[in-house]
């Protein structure tokens, strides 16, 4: 279901929506990008405008696109036939640019694979590829200089759109670059083929290009010899970073660009297949914005039958997003975005009175003598109803990983569960008990399905049913309300806070940060039932 959510208001029913989340703070998770094929028609979408009146903002747009796909991506076709298909998608792009221009949009982002589609072989994608000169070497305006290079029709159209809309434009396409046999890495067919993002300024100049580094089962494309660490400057918001889809889970280029170039804004074309409970598209987008205190402009393709939906304009404190697994329509999101994003309140700069639950949390962390630690519970002088018996530990598969979990029973309690070196802790209270099973899970190890990467995860999840073996299943609805602290002794500083409530709603934590060498997330007053609250740590050096 898709719906709108505005802090302080009631949920409004809407057939197609952008979910608007305003508020003190926000965070979320991560995911896998993939591609399969299905023929879907073209739709031009609705658009949502989020209105804010900050002095220092710019207007951004992201477009979730139900791309018109090749009916047979394995077939060998002519360049002309390939252009006919791509021009159908580009016609829709142009309509979105003109709609955005009427709203004074200054930058628009289109999704990965939105122009050419997916599931090609190296040979069958060739007619879809544009020649790509290096913007570092050649200054070029494709719209004004269309005959300078052959096989650049897609680049020309995108350049002209940027001019017509008077906006920066970010899009993704397949590109080719010839190589010489003297190059030991040159493929046998004499060319490199790249999954490429391009950036045009509002005057149509090709500002830069980024070639995807972390391919996700994309046999049609090559990995660049060196990682493209690409940033571009704008007159309206300063410096932006750029990367694509699966890149978000790896150090290069995503983390390195943020660390080395001090960017406050990221443009992020993606073709992301949702996988709950931890890796939905809007989860990772939001988590990235919160973890680094930046703005993320994320555009996904829209193919619900493939599990592909979820785009958004995310700041650390609010999100304007779209997720709809039922409707085939596209969606244009437009929002005003702060030039200087404000981050969440961390442990080190929190002010005001500490609430009782936080005092309890701090006592437990400090090993306060008023608290006696047992295997699974803590008895503090003011706590009367902790879990008397330690709940059983069990194992269940979540996201293809073997999690160790404990059930979350009762209206209040303190639990912990450990695996390898990671221990996860939960201090919670519930106003009422729901007829649902929740569990606290831990995983510390190498994830090896659909990519290989080392993760440390502490997760509070609603299980699919009442049996322990249902914990880790994909669910989107829940009624359980919690006030809680979730924390763990992570051995990485790269921790992404995942927070999802009923109906694919992005939730805002009250506080995040380090306390006594443990990273914690605190939340009270959920807006709807809890689906997932997790801390997703990445140990890049152990990949």
Swiss-Prot record:
EC number annotated for this UniProt entry: 3.5.1.12
Domain CN hydrolase: 72-351
Subcellular location: Secreted, Extracellular space
Active site as annotated: 112, 212, 245
Record-level GO cellular component terms: extracellular exosome; extracellular region; extracellular space; mitochondrial matrix
Domain of life: Eukaryota
Record note on what altering residue 171 to T does: In BTD deficiency
Keyword tags: Disease variant, Glycoprotein, Hydrolase, Secreted, Signal
A biological-process GO annotation: central nervous system development
Signal sequence extent: 1-41
Catalytic activity entry: biocytin + H2O = biotin + L-lysine; biotin amide + H2O = biotin + NH4(+)
SUPFAM superfamilies the UniProt entry points to: Carbon-nitrogen hydrolase
Example of a GO MF term: biotinidase activity
One Pfam family here: CN_hydrolase
Residues with attached carbohydrate: 119, 150, 203, 349, 402, 489
Disease annotated for this entry: Biotinidase deficiency: A juvenile form of multiple carboxylase deficiency, an autosomal recessive disorder of biotin metabolism, characterized by ketoacidosis, hyperammonemia, excretion of abnormal organic acid metabolites, and dermatitis. Biotinidase deficiency is characterized by seizures, hypotonia, skin rash, alopecia, ataxia, hearing loss, and optic atrophy. If untreated, symptoms usually become progressively worse, and coma and death may occur.
Entry's family note: Belongs to the carbon-nitrogen hydrolase superfamily. BTD/VNN family.
Function: Catalytic release of biotin from biocytin, the product of biotin-dependent carboxylases degradation.
Name of the protein this chain belongs to: Biotinidase
Organism: Homo sapiens (Human)
